[in-house]
Regions:
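Generic low-complexity segments that are intrinsically disordered, proline-rich and/or Lys/Arg-biased
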Residues: 49, 59-61, 69, 150, ...
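Juxtamembrane amphipathic/hinge helix adjacent to a transmembrane helix
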Residues: 96-108, 136-144, 196
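Alpha-helical transmembrane spans
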Residues: 1-29, 113-185
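Cytosolic/matrix-facing juxtamembrane and C-terminal tails of multi-pass cellular membrane proteins
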Residues: 174-203
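Membrane-interface amphipathic/juxtamembrane segments adjacent to transmembrane helices
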Residues: 24-62
């Protein structure tokens, strides 16, 4: 039984690692990979002159990568360049989709999260919530709420379960806000470059 559990844990860790590698790789396929969790639009100048021969534009806190064939710019934050130098379990990347190079083209910005982060988070909340509900149902059927001490114990344990859910929610929200702030810092840095430099090929 222990061997089966160990094998399952190794498989899960392997799948999560593979998911993160696929999510952070410098490949055009990363454009549609992950769970889309945010969208916004803005009109900006887009020119290949801002990027090097490989399509890279180094930024103070990350990298912008131009993919002309996909009409997109990938934003990859570098967590080591921020004040809090650690990566959470909910990293984000972003992709800006455009129709053509222009002095004023509409950019569609999409934020994405790894599938494993979203699925494991949902699984954790469902497990805790499901376990709490199952406990309350079985406790009530066993007559646990029939007496005052039993009712007090049931309410206390239920409150503990709710605190666990609340703590998990706080962690997820705090981590998401941190990663979103990092991504938006890189987005603002790219935006500053696009707004500052005059286009050479389009003028």
């Amino acid at each position: 039984m222990q061997a089966v559990i160990l094998l399952g844990a190794v498989i899960v860790v392997g799948l999560v690692a593979a998911d993160w590698i696929a999510f952070t790789r410098k490949n055009p396929r990363v454009l549609g990979y992950g769970l889309a969790i945010g969208r916004q639009q803005e009109a900006l100048r887009v020119s290949p002159d801002d990027f090097d021969a490989n399509g890279y534009l180094p930024l103070p806190h990350g990298l912008a990568w131009l993919c002309p064939g996909q009409h997109a710019i990938i934003l990859l934050p570098e967590w080591k360049r921020f004040g809090l130098r650690f990566r959470t379990a909910w990293p984000l990347n972003g992709a800006l989709h455009y129709d053509s190079f222009s002095d004023c083209t509409e950019l569609r910005f999409i934020k994405r999260m790894p599938w494993s982060s979203a699925l494991l988070t949902a699984l954790w909340f469902l497990t805790v919530a499901g376990g709490l509900i199952a406990y309350l149902v079985s406790y009530a059927r066993a007559g646990g709420f029939a007496s005052a001490p039993g009712a007090f114990l049931g309410v206390a344990l239920s409150g503990l379960g709710l605190l666990v859910l609340l703590f998990g929610l706080i962690v997820v929200v705090a981590a998401y806000r941190l990663e979103d702030k990092r991504l938006m810092v890189v987005y603002d840095e790219l935006r500053a470059v696009l707004c500052e430099k005059p286009s050479q090929k389009l003028d």
